[in-house]
Amino acid sequence: TMPEKYLEGFRNGTRVSYKNSGKPYIHNPAVTIMVPNKEETEALAHEVITKLNKTKGPTALIVPMRGWSAYDQSAEEASIEKGWAKENGDGPVWWPDPDNPKWSRRATLMWDVFMKNWDRNNDNLDIIKCDNHILDVEFAEFLNRCMGDMLDKKWKKGMYRDLKNVVE
């Protein structure tokens, strides 16, 4: 069961519905998938960046622009290994960005909020835009590299800007 205000969002299009059905994606009888709408995504991003701006130690917010879950990917991007079969079409919560359809609209909304509110004077905080999906092996390898550099005290803000999938 889901509160009526959320169901109304699926019906009126303010929430991404499964195959434009006006309904949420029901994974199984116990799990219904619902992701944040535009306003909720922006509020979440603002909350995240407000907290991260206060960091006193090495911190990198690495944003995967091609999607954030198995259900948040285009059919072109989908694979069994990433949790959504290409034959099923777009993931049930995939919301492509109108300016860059290979990127998630939620990711671009969050990125915009991060850029507007990021304390660029905090040398402990870097925000990195990656042309990856969160489930890409290359993305996981990059996260591991970044964490390793932090643990080894080699990390510096801006040090990854020349990597292949780093866009900003």
Give, region by region, the residue ranges found by the protein language model.
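C-terminal non-catalytic interaction/assembly regions of soluble proteins
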Residues: K5-E168
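Oxyanion-binding "anion nests"
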Residues: T1
